[in-house]
Amino acid sequence: MDATTTSFKSNAKVALGDEQLQRALSGLPGGLVAQRTAARDRLPEFEHLRDVGKEIRDHALEHLDLYLELYERNATAAGAHVHWARDAAEARQIILKICQDADAKLVTKGKSMISEEIALNDHLEEAGLEVAETDLGEYIIQLRSEHPSHIIAPSIHLTQDQVEEDFRKVHTHLPEDRVLEEPAQLVDEARKVLREKYLTADVGITGANFLIAETGSSIIVTNEGNGDLTQSLAKTHVVVASIDKVIPTLEDVTSILRLLARSATGQEFSTYTTFSTGARRPSDPDGPEAYHVVLLDNGRSDMLATEFREVLRCIRCGACMNHCPVYNAIGGHAYGWVYPGPIGSVLTPSLIGVKEAGHLPNASTFCGRCTEVCPMKIPLPKLMRHHREAEFEAGD
């Protein structure tokens, strides 16, 4: 997606004056924040797990080359085709060629922030493919030609009335007098529409919460089951993930999974935690005939040599956003690129440059709540200060 980070101040001003957005954001502090607190309190070893998770991620990043090679070796042995992409353009071209080789017309997608980072949907659509988002929040914002405003809740900036209006505008094949007064009715309608997409898709594309070097597996974590249908019903499954997602062992990833859902939504575990290892075997009842993994660098190797390597520990739980007073005031779109909130204020300048995103590290009260709740103990305020120093030294 095109960055509007240089317009952050004007974006924020518009967001503060948007009454519908403010209504949508008003429930955030009392919802996800309270659920995380309750989940933490129910797990006495939560703080110990944070230390363990940090150590695992630091170790993996310190030996990233070793674990990426191990992952590739084991994934290939399990029947995967592993592709390496230096940047967004290369990743887009690799994925498009996979789709073209599969003679694809329809592509279903699970929720993937990396696909947003590389602007994958636009590229595939420009090549004549139909792309259908299957995560409910992603589907809703796709109808509106918008981008996610939150890492785990893409449509959190919308009210129920707005979603109903969009469904009535787009789902014109359904009866006009149908009742859409309750969230469950909206979900049911989306399920019926998306079911047809699953059954006719040629390629399914998902992200990966983690990649396991020990087994060559990828993991997706969802609450809707859309990821499972996306990757198992299409004949070709494509995983697109950044290189920092690799974890050494199954035991390691189990420790981190205990932190992920609790930090994100307050659940002990998400409803679906799915491991994928290679294509369908002869004895398997379902699954893809071809399994591809696209590993994206896009500046992350360069980050490893800087003080910003700590941000690569991020497991995309969104807790920093939920607890951030700035995010709670303006939402995610004001940040102007893929990653909003405190994590975006550090990651975005690291990926696209301080010149383009220098306003974001200034969008902070430096209250420190983001670091207090981060399951990976990323010192986000400290890293924002480093970006601010770079901006000052550049004279911008």
Show where each model-derived region lies.
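Ferredoxin-type iron-sulfur electron-transfer modules in oxidoreductases and energy-metabolism complexes
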Residues: 283-311, 326-396
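Generic, well-ordered alpha-helical scaffold segments in large soluble proteins
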Residues: 70, 74, 78, 94-98, ...
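Conserved structured core elements
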Residues: 65, 85, 89, 188, ...
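The feature marks the mature, well-folded catalytic cores of soluble enzymes
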Residues: 1-308
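Acidic/polar loop patches that form or flank catalytic/metal-binding clefts of enzymes
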Residues: 248-250, 264-269, 322, 329, ...
